[in-house]
Amino acid sequence: MTWWNRRNTKAITMLVKQIAALTAMLTVLSCAGCATSSPNDNEQSQSSDSSQTHEQVKKSAEQSIDGAHLRDNESLYKVYDDSGVETMYLTVSRGNSSEGTDHSWSEINQYSVDDYAAMGVDRYKVNGLLQVGDEQGPVSGELGFGESAPNATVQIRGQSSSKNEQKNYKIELKSGKGKWRGQRTIALNKHMGEGLRFRNKMAYDLIKGIDQMMGLRTQFVHLYVKDETSGSDSFDDYGLYTQVEQLNKTALQVHGLD
């Protein structure tokens, strides 16, 4: 080993010893402020705890959810007969800008959700008069019978389905204008992508018979529309729709899930 290498080795050894000494010193200093509990402290704490008094309360026994089951409100499906086809008559008219209903029926059916996103506006609405009846016309005792003023607003519903030629509709009954089967929001789905047009309702009907499964009320609807925004004075046949109960606070309440 050369003189130069011996000198470097000696310097490195000294540096390592200095680092070790500095580390030990820092360790001692870091613990200098550590507090230790004395027997007197423990005695004072125990004395303080023993001097406290408590007010007695009665607690209910803990209830286990192991035996609880999710159950739908079965009686809800027995109130109305949903095995047939309900007939609805919808008269649409132009409203006003303050309610966002100052649009034509053609505009409602023209745009998809992508169009609204590109325009940066909410979905257009029109005024609507919804009446329920049979193939002969609105029936007394049913929603909208004998009325001429709008009782609802109408807009398209759905996402990708809004691009279809035949639209799905959301009919929102106005406050104080009544309800249809306890519902103010009536969703009508066309199911253009489903050739049979009945599988959605069939699925909900099957769910009703399965324990611990939650369903929604459904109904086939034959829809007629009179477009007063274009000057029409007669109802056009829009064909078969599936009405599906809107999953909102009202639905959660009647199904016992609120």
Q: Which residue ranges define each predicted feature?
A:
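Generic early N-terminus positional signal peaking at residue ~5-7
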Residues: 6-7, 19-20, 39
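Sec-dependent N-terminal signal peptides of Gram-positive bacterial secreted proteins and lipoproteins
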Residues: 15-36
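Phosphate/dinucleotide-binding and metal-coordinating scaffold of catalytic cores
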Residues: 34-258
